[in-house]
Amino acid sequence: MMPTRAEAEKILEEAEQCNSGPWVNHSRITAKCAEKIAKLCENLDSEKAYILGLLHDIGRKFGVRHLGHVYDGYTYMMSLGYDEVAKICLTHSFNNSTVKEYIGKFDVSDEELELIETALAKVNMDDYDKLIQLCDALAGSDGVLNIEDRMRDVKQRYGYYPQEKWNSNIRLKNYFEKKTGNNIYKIVNQS
C-alpha cells in the first residue's frame, strides 16, 4: 500500500516541520529524477516512482540519525500501512542488500539493527528499489549531480566509500541507461 502523491507531499511537509534540513530538498530532487526515469521504463509507474523517491528518507523526520533514519523510516511507514514505501526506506541505503556497506554512523540499538538486518534479508529487490538507489546517488540538496562527483562528496564527508557500493551505483546507472535507451543525465536534466 502507498499514499497518494498529495498524501506523500503532506507527509514530507509535516516531516520538514519536525526536522528541516537539506534532506528535504534532496528528497524532492530524488523524486523528480525517479519520475523522469520511470516514464521511460515500460515496467515502472512514474507516479509510484515519484512517491517512493519523495519518502525514501522520511526517517529523518525524527532527528539527525545515520543508520537510524533507515530504521525510523521503515517503522514509521509500516505503522501507517505503507509497506511499499517502508521497503524503499529500508533498501535505499543497501544496493547489495548488506548492512556492511552502510556509509555513516551505526547509531542504532542492537534491536534496531536486528530488525533492519532481518527485514533486509527478506527483501527481493525490484526495479523500484534500484531506481531509488540510483536517484538517491544522483540527487544532491541543490540539484542533480554527476554520480561520481556525488560519491566523491560522500567519501570526503565520511572518510570512505566502499568500492562495491561505488561499483553498484555505476551498474545501476548503466542498467537504467540501457533500459531507457538514454543518457541518465539527459533524462534528469543534469547540467
Identify the function of each model-found stretch.
Residues M1-R5, S27:
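Conserved N-terminal diphosphate/IPP-binding helix and adjacent helical/loop segment
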Residues R5-N19:
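Generic N-terminal amphipathic, Lys/Arg-enriched alpha-helix
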Residues E7, E42, E101, R157, ...:
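Active-site helical microenvironments for divalent-metal-assisted chemistry
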Residues E13, L40-V154:
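Divalent metal-dependent catalytic cores for phosphoryl transfer on phosphate-bearing substrates
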Residues P22-V24:
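A short, charge-rich alpha-helical start-of-domain segment used by transcription regulators
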Residues Y160-S191:
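Charged phosphate-binding loop/patch that engages nucleotide di/tri-phosphates or the phosphate backbone
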